[in-house]
């Protein structure tokens, strides 16, 4: 099945502590999760790695969030939207369900 949300899509969080926040998808994981820029930040305690000259400490980084908890953001309407698929010139393309506009 084709992915409805892909890397570099702008998404909005639907549920959880970051509800309503927007960000760009950095990575889509095969486990049905996505990593979004600036969303679901967690603090990770990291050991120093002298071989790589990497200091230890508490590092803040993005954690994965379920793909069902985010929706693609439609800039034309300014709201979250659903994604559909159709064929244009023999190619499968994604489109916004609300206004039938093709996504990138």
Swiss-Prot record:
Gene Ontology BP term (one): translation
Q: Name one Pfam family in it.
A: KOW
Alphabetical GO CC annotations of the entry are: cytosol; ribonucleoprotein complex; ribosome
Which PROSITE patterns would you find in this protein's record?
A: RIBOSOMAL_L24 (PS01108)
- What InterPro entries does the record tag this protein with? KOW, Rib_uL2_dom2, Ribosomal_uL24, Ribosomal_uL24_CS, Ribosomal_uL24_KOW, Translation_prot_SH3-like_sf
What the entry lists under CDD domains is as follows: KOW_RPL26 (cd06089)
| Annotated disulfide bonds | none
Q: Name one GO molecular function term.
A: rRNA binding
Q: Which UniProt keywords apply?
A: Ribonucleoprotein, Ribosomal protein, RNA-binding, rRNA-binding
Q: Give coiled-coil spans as residue ranges.
A: none
Which family is annotated?
Answer: Belongs to the universal ribosomal protein uL24 family.
**What does the subunit comment say?**
Part of the 50S ribosomal subunit.
- Role according to the record: One of two assembly initiator proteins, it binds directly to the 5'-end of the 23S rRNA, where it nucleates assembly of the 50S subunit. One of the proteins that surrounds the polypeptide exit tunnel on the outside of the subunit.
Protein name (record): Large ribosomal subunit protein uL24
**Taxonomic source organism:** Salmonella typhi
